[in-house]
UniProtKB/Swiss-Prot annotation:
The gene is TUBGCP3. Residues 210-230 have a biased composition (Polar residues). This is Gamma-tubulin complex component 3. One of its GO terms (biological process) is single fertilization. Residues 210-241 are annotated as: Disordered. Keywords: Acetylation, Cytoplasm, Cytoskeleton, Microtubule, Phosphoprotein. The keyword Membrane does not apply. Component of the gamma-tubulin ring complex (gTuRC) consisting of TUBGCP2, TUBGCP3, TUBGCP4, TUBGCP5 and TUBGCP6 and gamma-tubulin TUBG1 or TUBG2. TUBGCP2, TUBGCP3, TUBGCP4, TUBGCP5 and TUBGCP6 assemble in a 5:5:2:1:1 stoichiometry; each is associated with a gamma-tubulin, thereby arranging 14 gamma-tubulins in a helical manner. Gamma-tubulin at the first position is blocked by TUBGCP3 at the last position, allowing 13 protafilaments to grow into a microtubule. It is found in: Cytoplasm, Cytoskeleton, Microtubule organizing center, Centrosome. Ubiquitously expressed. It comes from Homo sapiens (Human). Belongs to the TUBGCP family.
Length: 907
C-alpha cells in the first residue's frame, strides 16, 4: 500500500516529470523545479473566457468533421441559450462540452511529442531558479501558503519566480526561496485537490503545442511564446501600478478594437473621440504609436456602423438610402471576413501554445501591412458617410457619384460598386416611369414629383414636375427633362386622350437594369447605352402623342382656326360680319342680346368661305359679350370666342385664350377704325357731287378730306404693321416650329412665344402701356371725326335740301303763272342762308381743333415709338412720318429722328 508521501502532489508531480521525460529522479531535478514554479505561480487561466470564441471553436470542429447540419443546429441552440438568463456560466458549459468532445485516442501522440518539447524548452526557461535537488515530499505547492510566507522572505516565489517573467523577461538567477527547502512542508488540508486543479490547468496550457518532435524550437522562439503567455497571465495577476504590455497582448486588443469593442488595454476615449492605450500601461512609444494607428480602423468601423444602425430602421430613408446601407453592410462583411482570418491566425497560435518563431506570429507590423487596403476602404466609406449625411434619394446618389471623380483607381472602383447598388432603385424608378408611366415613389426619392391634387385638365402643366435636388449628377438636365416628358406623355395619353394603347406598341421596350450589376454595366456607358434608351423612349412616345393629337383631335386645324377667326385672318368673313353687326353694335351695350348676335354670326358663316370649315371648328365658334361699363356701345363689348376642351385645352389654356381675347379686341378695334374711315371716304365720294352747288362749304370739306387722309395713312400703316410684321411673321415662325416639334412641350412653348410676341408688338404688354393709351386716343379721334363729319354732312345736306325745295317751289309757282317768291320769302331765305354760312366757321373751327388734337396725339405716339426698345416699333415711326410732316411740327421728333437717321447712315 502506498504511503501518504507517495500520494502527495509533490511526489505525483515528480513522477509525472519522470514519466514524460523517461528519466530518473536525479536527471529530472531541473525540470521538476520548473514545474514547481509553474504550478506555484499566479498565472491566469490559459483559456480565454470568451463564450463566442468557444462557440466558434465548436462550430469549426463540427464543420471540420463534415457535420454542417449539426453546426447549424448548434448555432441555433446557442442563440436560444444566449437569449435566456437561466444559466450564468455559459462559457464554462461550452468549454466543458468542447473538452468532452476531444478524441482520447489522440493523447498518446501528443505526449510523445510533448516529451521532446518539454525536455528542450524547459532548461532554457528555468534559469532564474538555481539547480538543486530536494525531496518532492517537502515542497509546498499551495499558493495561499506561499503568499503567507512571502512577508518573511524577500526572495519568495511571487517576486523571483516565473510570474516575474512578464516584467523582466527572465533577467537572471535569484536566490532559492526558503519555502522550497527540504523539510518545510506545511500544506493545509485539501491542498492535494487544489494542486490537482492547478496542475491540470497549468500543464494543459504548457503542453498544448502539438508540434513534431523533429522541429526543435530555437532560442528566439520560446521566449516569444513565453512572453505572449506571460502577458495573458497579467490579466488576472498584477493589477496595481503600471503594467508592461507585450505586443501579443496589444495584438489581441487590436483585433477587438477593429470590431469596435474595447480591449483590456485599448479603450475608446469619449472625450477625444478616439481609441487610446490606458495611461497606466508601461508601453514603448513605437508600440503605442502603432497601436493608435491601427485603432483608427476601429474608429472608422464605429462611424460606419453607427450610420447604418441609425438608418437601417428609418423607413423614411427610402429605398436608395437602404441600398446605401446595404452597400455599407456588404463592405463591412468583407472587413469582418478579414478579421475572422486574423482571429483564426491568432487562435491557431493560441492552440499551438508555444510558437515556432517570430516569422509566423501575428505582430502589429504585420497588422499594419494586412490592414492597409481595408483602412483605405474604410476611410472612403467614412468619407461617404459624412458626405451623405442628411441626403436621400437622387441627392444621395449624386453625393456618392461625386466620389467617383478621383484619380485613384482603387477608390474609384469601390465607389463605383457602391454607386451601382445605390443607383439601382433610382434606375428602377426611372424604367418603371418611362416604360409604364407609373410613379411609385413613397419616400419622394425620384426626381419626378407628382401632385395628386391636380385635376386632369392641368395634368400636363402642373401634375408632374422635376425635383431638381433629386436629379442624380450622372444625369444631365436634358436627360431629366426627357424622362419627365416620357412618363408624362404616357399618362396624358391614358388619362386625357383616353388612349389605352399598351406602351409596348408605342415603345420598343428594351431590357432595363434588373440588378445592381446591370446598373453598373449601364453606368460604364452613360453617353451611349443609357442615352440611347432614353432617346428611343422619348422620340417614340412623343411621336405617338403628337400623332394622336393631330389625327384624332385635329390640333393643327384648331390652331389655324384660331388664326382665321380670333386673329381676323379670314378677311371676307370679318368684313361681312361687321356689315351685319353694324346696326346692332351701334346701339348701347345694355340693349344687346347674345342670341341675336349668335344668329348674325351663323349668317356670316354661311355667306362666306367660312362655311367650308370643319363642323367641329364651326361648332366651337361663338359670340361673347364683355363686361359692360357705363356709356359702352356694342362695339366695345362684342368679341368672338372659341371653345376648347379635352386634350387641345392643354395647348390652348385659359391663359392663352385670355391672350387671344385681348388680341382680338385690339384687332377688332383697329379693324373698326379701318371700317369707319372707309365709311368716311365713301361719304366724301358720295357727298362731293351733291355739295358741289354749295361753294361756301368747300373749305369745310377740304379740311375733312385732309384730316381723314392723315387718319387713313396712319391706320393703313398700323394695319400693315399688325398684319404683316406682327401676325404673319409670328405665325410663320410658329408654324415652322410646330412642324418641327419633337414633343408636346415644344408646341406649347412655341405657341406661348407666338402669343407673347403678338402681345408685345401689338402694344398690349405692360411696357407699352403709354403707347397703347396714345393709340387708343388716336382711335377716339377717328370716331370723333366720324361724328363731326356726320354732323357736318347732315347740316349741309339739310341746307341743300331746303335750298332745293325753295328752288323747286319757285319753279312751280312760275309754271302756275305766279311770282316765284315774294319779297318776304326771299328775305327769309336769305336770312336762313346767312345763318348757315355763319355756322360754317364754327364747323371749320371744330375741325381745326380736332386736327390739332389728333396731330398732337400722333406726334406724342411717334416720340414714344422712337424711344421704344423694339426695333420694329422704331421702324414703324419712319413709315408713319415718311414725309417728315410731324417732324417739322415736333422738336423732339427732329432730335430723335435725326439722331436715329445719323445712326442708320453710319451703320
Amino acid at each position: 500500500m502506498a504511503t501518504p508521501d507517495q500520494k502527495s502532489p509533490n511526489v505525483l508531480l515528480q513522477n509525472l516529470c519522470c514519466r514524460i521525460l523517461g528519466r530518473s529522479e536525479a536527471d529530472v531535478a531541473q525540470q521538476f523545479q520548473y514545474a514547481v514554479r509553474v504550478i506555484g505561480s499566479n498565472f491566469a487561466p490559459t483559456v480565454e473566457r470568451d463564450e463566442f470564441l468557444v462557440a466558434e471553436k465548436i462550430k469549426k470542429e463540427l464543420i471540420r468533421q463534415r457535420r454542417e447540419a449539426d453546426a447549424a443546429l448548434f448555432s441555433e441552440l446557442h442563440r436560444k441559450l444566449h437569449s435566456q438568463g437561466v444559466l450564468k456560466n455559459k462559457w464554462s458549459i461550452l468549454y466543458l462540452l468542447l473538452s468532452l468532445s476531444e478524441d482520447p485516442r489522440r493523447q498518446p501522440s501528443k505526449v510523445s511529442s510533448y516529451a521532446t518539447l518539454f525536455a528542450q524548452a524547459l532548461p532554457r526557461d528555468a534559469h532564474s531558479t538555481p539547480y538543486y535537488y530536494a525531496r518532492p515530499q517537502t515542497l509546498p505547492l499551495s499558493y495561499q501558503d506561499r503568499s503567507a510566507q512571502s512577508a518573511q522572505s524577500s526572495g519568495s516565489v511571487g517576486s523571483s519566480g516565473i510570474s516575474s517573467i512578464g516584467l523582466c523577461a527572465l533577467s537572471g538567477p535569484a536566490p532559492a526561496p526558503q519555502s522550497l527547502l527540504p523539510g518545510q512542508s506545511n500544506q493545509a488540508p485539501g491542498v492535494g485537490d487544489c494542486l490537482r486543479q492547478q496542475l491540470g490547468s497549468r500543464l494543459a496550457w504548457t503542453l498544448t503545442a502539438n508540434q513534431p518532435s523533429s522541429q526543435a524550437t530555437t532560442s528566439k522562439g520560446v521566449p516569444s511564446a513565453v512572453s505572449r503567455n506571460m502577458t495573458r497571465s497579467r490579466r488576472e495577476g498584477d493589477t496595481g501600478g503600471t503594467m508592461e504590455i507585450t505586443e501579443a497582448a496589444l495584438v489581441r486588443d487590436i483585433l477587438y478594437v477593429f470590431q469596435g469593442i474595447d480591449g483590456k488595454n485599448i479603450k475608446m476615449n469619449n472625450t477625444e473621440n478616439c481609441y487610446k492605450v490606458e495611461g497606466k500601461a508601461n508601453l514603448s512609444r513605437s508600440l503605442r504609436d502603432t497601436a493608435v494607428r491601427l485603432s483608427e480602423l476601429g474608429w472608422l468601423h464605429n462611424k460606419i456602423r453607427r450610420y447604418t444602425d441609425q438608418r437601417s430602421l428609418d423607413r423614411s430613408f427610402g429605398l436608395v438610402g437602404q441600398s446605401f446601407c446595404a452597400a455599407l453592410h456588404q463592405e463591412l462583411r468583407e472587413y469582418y471576413r478579414l478579421l475572422s482570418v486574423l482571429h483564426s491566425q491568432l487562435q491557431l497560435e493560441d492552440d499551438q501554445g508555444v510558437n515556432l518563431g517570430l516569422e509566423s506570429s501575428l505582430t502589429l507590423r504585420r497588422l499594419l501591412v494586412w490592414t492597409y487596403d481595408p483602412k483605405i476602404r474604410l476611410k472612403t466609406l467614412a468619407a461617404l458617410v459624412d458626405h451623405c449625411q442628411g441626403r436621400k434619394g437622387g441627392e444621395l446618389a449624386s453625393a456618392v457619384h461625386a466620389y467617383t471623380k478621383t484619380g485613384d483607381p482603387y477608390m474609384r472602383s469601390l465607389v463605383q460598386h457602391i454607386l451601382s447598388l445605390v443607383s439601382h432603385p433610382v434606375l428602377s424608378f426611372l424604367y418603371r416611369w418611362i416604360y409604364d408611366g407609373e410613379l411609385e415613389d413613397t419616400y419622394h426619392e425620384f426626381f419626378v414629383a407628382s401632385d395628386p391634387t391636380v385635376k386632369t385638365d392641368r395634368l400636363w402643366h402642373d401634375k408632374y414636375t422635376l425635383r431638381k435636388s433629386m436629379i442624380p449628377s450622372f444625369m444631365t438636365m436634358d436627360q431629366s427633362r426627357k424622362v419627365l416628358l416620357i412618363g408624362k406623355s404616357i399618362n396624358f395619353l391614358h388619362q386625357v386622350c383616353h388612349d389605352q394603347t399598351p406602351t409596348t406598341k408605342m415603345i420598343a421596350v428594351t431590357k432595363s437594369a434588373e440588378s445592381p450589376q446591370d446598373a453598373a454595366d449601364l453606368f460604364t456607358d452613360l453617353e451611349n447605352a443609357f442615352q440611347g434608351k432614353i432617346d428611343a423612349a422619348y422620340f417614340e412616345t412623343s411621336k405617338y402623342l403628337l400623332d394622336v393629337l393631330n389625327k384624332k383631335y385635329s390640333l393643327l386645324d384648331h390652331m389655324q382656326a384660331m388664326r382665321r377667326y380670333l386673329l381676323l385672318g379670314q378677311g371676307d368673313f370679318i368684313r361681312h360680319l361687321m356689315d351685319l353687326l353694324k346696326p346692332e353694335l351701334v346701339r348701347p351695350a345694355t340693349t344687346l342680346y347674345q342670341h341675336n348676335l349668335t344668329g348674325i354670326l351663323e349668317t356670316a358663316v354661311r355667306a362666306t368661305n367660312a362655311q367650308f370649315d370643319s363642323p367641329e371648328i364651326l361648332r366651337r365658334l361663338d359670340v361673347r359679350l364683355l363686361e359692360v361699363s357705363p356709356g359702352d356701345t356694342g362695339w366695345d363689348v362684342f368679341s368672338l370666342d372659341y371653345h376648347v376642351d379635352g386634350p387641345i385645352a392643354t395647348v390652348f389654356t385659359r391663359e392663352c385664350m385670355s391672350h387671344y381675347l385681348r388680341v382680338f379686341n385690339f384687332l377688332w378695334r383697329a379693324k373698326r377704325m379701318e371700317y369707319i374711315l372707309t365709311d368716311i371716304r365713301k361719304g366724301h365720294m358720295c357727298n362731293a357731287k351733291l355739295l358741289r352747288n354749295m361753294p361756301e362749304f368747300s373749305g369745310v370739306l377740304h379740311q375733312c378730306h385732309i384730316l381723314a387722309s392723315e387718319m387713313v395713312h396712319f391706320i393703313h400703316q398700323m394695319q400693315y404693321y399688325i398684319t404683316f410684321e406682327v401676325l404673319e411673321c409670328s405665325w410663320d415662325e410658329l408654324w415652322n416650329k410646330v412642324q418641327q416639334a419633337q414633343d408636346l412641350d415644344h408646341i406649347i412653348a412655341a405657341h406661348e412665344v407666338f402669343l407673347d410676341t403678338i402681345i408685345s408688338r401689338c402694344l398690349l404688354d405692360s411696357d407699352s402701356r403709354a403707347l397703347l393709351n396714345q393709340l387708343r386716343a388716336v382711335f377716339d379721334q377717328i370716331i370723333e371725326l366720324q361724328n363731326a363729319q356726320d354732323a357736318i354732312y347732315r347740316a349741309a345736306l339739310e341746307e341743300l335740301q331746303r335750298r332745293l325745295q325753295f328752288e323747286e317751289k319757285k319753279k312751280q309757282r312760275e309754271i302756275e303763272g305766279q311770282w316765284g317768291v315774294t319779297a318776304a320769302e326771299e328775305e327769309e331765305e336769305n336770312k336762313r342762308i346767312g345763318e348757315f354760312k355763319e355756322s360754317i366757321p364754327k364747323m371749320c373751327s371744330q375741325l381745326r381743333i380736332l386736327t390739332h388734337f389728333y396731330q398732337g396725339i400722333v406726334q406724342q405716339f411717334l416720340v414714344l415709338l422712337t424711344t421704344s426698345s423694339d426695333e420694329s416699333l422704331r421702324f414703324l415711326s419712319f413709315r408713319l412720318d415718311f414725309n417728315e410732316h410731324y417732324k417739322a411740327r415736333e422738336p423732339r421728333l427732329r432730335v430723335s429722328l435725326g439722331t436715329r437717321g445719323r445712326r442708320s447712315s453710319h451703320t
